[in-house]
From Swiss-Prot:
Membership in a protein family: Belongs to the class-I aminoacyl-tRNA synthetase family.
Alphabetic keyword roster: Aminoacyl-tRNA synthetase, ATP-binding, Cytoplasm, Ligase, Metal-binding, Nucleotide-binding, Protein biosynthesis, Zinc
Gene encoding the protein: cysS
Species, as recorded: Ruegeria sp. (strain TM1040) (Silicibacter sp.)
Cofactor(s) required for function per UniProt: Zn(2+)
Catalytic activity: tRNA(Cys) + L-cysteine + ATP = L-cysteinyl-tRNA(Cys) + AMP + diphosphate
Disulfide bond positions: none
Residues spanned by motif 'KMSKS' region: 271-275
GO terms, biological process: cysteinyl-tRNA aminoacylation
Record protein name field: Cysteine--tRNA ligase
Assembly, per entry: Monomer.
Domain of life of the native organism: Bacteria
Motif interval(s): 'HIGH' region: 32-42
Length: 457
């Protein structure tokens, strides 16, 4: 059997993955808070850990892997959105969940085995909080229930590599007066009449964010499971607090044995933000005509533990590559299994960049069947994602010859105005202009519009 190695954030080492039960490999991924469209950064862990799901299914069997990814549908951000819009909370969350599934489906992500909504697991959350209180790991104060960090100093901070004392010393937030320790965090909080709430032993209220994932993963996967994944921005406090809650409520269990965290995403070398004007939702890109398969390809070109930079150039190059690969694999059956080199790359801590490099080798060798099998393993080249590439291609040879002749003439006359005019027009039409001593190549980008070339005729 293939040996999978994963970088475990908890031990800070690459370890051989050994499942608790090879006949039921289990993974949990923290999902979105559903109040708005998923942005490009939200999509990265979905795509990355979709590849992990596919790899585990490849190695252990399609029916032997359980994947849970939650929806946080009770949160103050959702409450704020409802108040601002005048819409019902349930209407907003249901709509946003549907958006999320459609957008991630467009990126080729398989649906998880379980997609629990936090609001469906309130009784389990209350039961876990009661267990924590009974074990002296939590206390009630002014309608709130808080986790007592001092009750588990030996374990708290191991994932993020912080000590409780250092965290307290570095805290810059105002501490609620009812907390015994500044690092204590909320398990349950009271709800006003106009806020979502559920009856509990501590009055009407709602759960804190961290207890939601602990309760859902415990109910679906048990007190010990294999892999927990998420963005590295969740390592502290969310994942640290999950570990504390779960291990203290179920001391006989291990909770998650392997922790995987993906790095963050940038756009054109800068942090994505609305103030910089480089903030994109997945739907924004899809509506711009960038195929979901192209977005996925760009994601997979960077190892999940490295920062990823989304650029228009990468998207254009990805589209050109996928067009060539789809032409090579059209009308043929995939090989019986993906090439060993591709599987080995993925098995080495999800080295998707290495897998893509191996796929380039298969394409260069003309091995369409092998390329197709590898593509299906990483979620590329499937029929369901190929409609964009089936659009009739445009013969650009006349335009390439025209620009080449214009450049040759300009070299003689030193007047490059016509060359510049043509280049600007081709760029405006969504073509990437590649010029060399031997010729000109026009490569359609994601936003290519053939109609804009008519003005040059």
């Amino acid at each position: 059997m293939t040996t999978i190695k994963l970088h475990n954030s908890k031990t800070r080492k690459k370890e051989v993955f050994t499942p608790i039960d090879p006949d039921n490999v289990q993974m949990y991924v923290c999902g979105p808070t559903v109040y708005d469209r998923a942005h490009l950064g939200n999509a990265r862990p979905v795509v990355v850990f979709d590849v992990l799901f596919r790899l585990l299914r490849h190695v252990y069997g399609d029916k032997k892997v359980t994947y849970a990814r939650n929806f946080t549908d009770v949160d103050d951000k959702i409450n704020t959105r409802a108040a601002e819009s005048g819409r019902a909370i349930g209407e907003i969350t249901s709509e946003t969940i549907q958006w999320f599934l459609e957008d991630m489906g467009a990126l080729g992500a398989l649906q998880p085995t379980h997609m629990p909504r936090a609001t469906e697991y309130i009784p389990q959350m209350i039961a876990m909080i009661e267990e924590l209180i009974a074990r002296d790991h939590a206390y009630e104060a002014e309608g709130h229930v808080l986790f007592a960090v001092d009750s588990w100093r030996e374990g708290y901070g191991q994932l993020s590599g912080r000590s409780v004392d250092d965290m307290i010393a570095g805290a810059r937030v105002e501490v609620a007066p009812y907390k015994k320790n500044p690092m204590d965090f909320v398990l349950w909080k009271p709800s006003d009449a106009d806020q979502p709430g559920w009856e509990s032993p501590w009055g009407r209220g709602r759960p804190g964010w961290h207890i939601e994932c602990s309760a859902m993963s415990h109910d679906l996967l048990g007190e010990s499971f294999d892999i927990h994944c998420g963005g590295n921005d969740l390592m502290f406090p969310h994942h640290e607090n999950e570990i504390a809650q779960s291990c203290c409520a179920n001391p006989e269990g291990e909770f998650a044995r392997y922790w995987l965290h993906n790095e963050m995403l940038q756009v054109e070398g800068k942090k994505m933000s609305k103030s910089l004007g480089n903030f994109f939702t997945v739907r924004d890109l899809l509506d711009q005509g960038i195929p979901g398969e192209v977005v996925r390809f760009v994601f997979l070109q960077t190892h999940y533990r490295k920062p990823m930079d989304w650029t228009e150039k990468k998207a254009a190059e990805a589209e050109a590559t996928l067009r060539k690969w789809r032409a090579l694999t059209a009308g043929i059956e995939p090989a019986a299994t993906a090439a060993a080199a591709v599987v080995d790359a993925l098995s080495d801590d999800l080295n998707t960049a290495g897998a893509i490099a191996e796929m380039h080798k298969l394409a260069a060798a003309g091995d369409g069947a092998g390329l197709l099998a590898a593509g299906q393993l990483v979620g590329l080249l499937g029929d369901e994602m190929g409609e964009w590439a089936a659009a009739p291609s445009v013969d650009l040879s006349a335009h390439e010859a025209r620009l080449f002749k214009a450049r040759q003439a300009a070299m003689e006359t030193k007047d490059f105005s016509e060359v510049d005019r043509l280049k600007a027009a081709y760029t405006e039409a969504g073509l990437e202009v590649r010029m060399s001593k031997t010729g000109v190549e026009l490569v359609p980008g994601a936003g290519f519009d053939a109609a804009k070339l008519e003005a040059l005729s």
